[in-house]
Amino acid sequence: EYRKSMQGKIMKGVGGFYYIHPHNTVNTIYECKAKGAFRNQKIKPAVGDDVEIEIISEQDKTGNIVEILPRENLLIRPAVANVDQAVIVFALADPKPNYNLLDRFLIMMGQQGVETLICFNKSDLVSGQEAKEICDIYAGAGYQVFLTVAKENVGVDAFREAIRGKTSVFAGPSGVGKSSMLNALH
């Protein structure tokens, strides 16, 4: 039997289900499973993948992923594909920044050819001089660096402009303010 197919982007993946937003639609999401062929090939769909789906039920908005279209890039941690840029969020204090980890993130993104922005959050917890010195190091290495206090909306507007219209993945250690930053952007 012939099933209607369409292309879309994976917006979320939870427990073997993938939520696909079809191209050229507004506010439509299909819940899909990946065909067994992907498991046999040890390929796993990732958030951000452009995929071909076949519709099982138009009414229930369910389908199967039948093809993963060519990827521009693929990040392993977090597992996400076809991003325009990565945003690495670190706190300048509380928790104290692990610059070794930050540098590893930057190297990993660079190896994938992903443009990377650095957002130093909680910049109110250190002196202006210390914040400037840290920013100068990474800006001097060619990165766009932002100082923010997400909970007080400080520095958020400039940061919002830098990510506007781009598919961005946020990464960083626990407790640095990634969720606060995403909330401040809304």
Regions found by a protein language model. Give the residues of each.
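Short flexible coil/turn linkers enriched for glycine and charged/polar residues
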Residues: 12-14, 59, 82, 110-114, ...
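Residue-level signal for inorganic ion chemistry
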Residues: 48, 109, 121
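A conserved segment at the C-terminal end of the G1
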Residues: 179-186
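Histidine-anchored nucleotide/phosphate-binding helix
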Residues: 100-110, 115
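N-terminal accessory targeting/assembly segments
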Residues: 1-99
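Canonical P-loop GTPase G-domain recognition
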Residues: 125-176
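Conserved beta-strand/loop subsegment of P-loop NTPase cores
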Residues: 83-90, 112-121, 143-147
